[in-house]
Amino acid sequence: AHRIRQLLNGSENLAAHANCNRVQDPYSIRCIPQVHGASRNAWQHLLELTEIELNAVTDNPIITKTAEAISGGNFHGQPLAMALDYATVAAAEIGNIADRRCYLLLEGKNGLPRLLTTNSGRNAGLMIPQYTTAALVTENKTLCYPASADSIPTSLGQEDHVSMGSISGRKFNQVLGNLDKILAIELRDAAQAREFRRPLPFSAWLEFQLRLMRQQV
């Protein structure tokens, strides 16, 4: 919430809506700090566990200074596997709520034209990119099944419980790639919506970011 206040500081557009007739915004706007914050907590948890594992002794067996061989289980990937699955859900949820905000920008309410175009009857505007976000969000949901909940015995039963952490890592990376695309579409939609809010400026930081984006799109 503090970060959002910083980003919006000095926005004349925000000030102009201080006493408008909108009682409550939809959850996807009003609950951004709570939803994004929950995802941030999940990623922080993954970071903490990753640092622990990077500094841990994971060899097996462990050879001591006295040349004693000690068999152990520090190599097991369950700590990271479960954290990666948790982080995957967190990343997918950021995309889920972003898609809802994209939809809000396109539905033709609160002074914005439908599909963010002035001729929505003949011009599809930004309708198709929202198809993309919807598809990517759905794909991310299918990738949220926790790989760490599964286990297949190997090595004649000696390795009878495995973490499937490599699968967790691959799924996390795939969801992050999809999330990049979803957020890029949301940014482009927001920039287009901004054009219909002129001449009132947003905050200096947001105006700067929009100018950078408009140099590319």
Place the predicted regions along the sequence by residue.
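C-terminal auxiliary extensions adjacent to catalytic cores
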Residues: 1-217
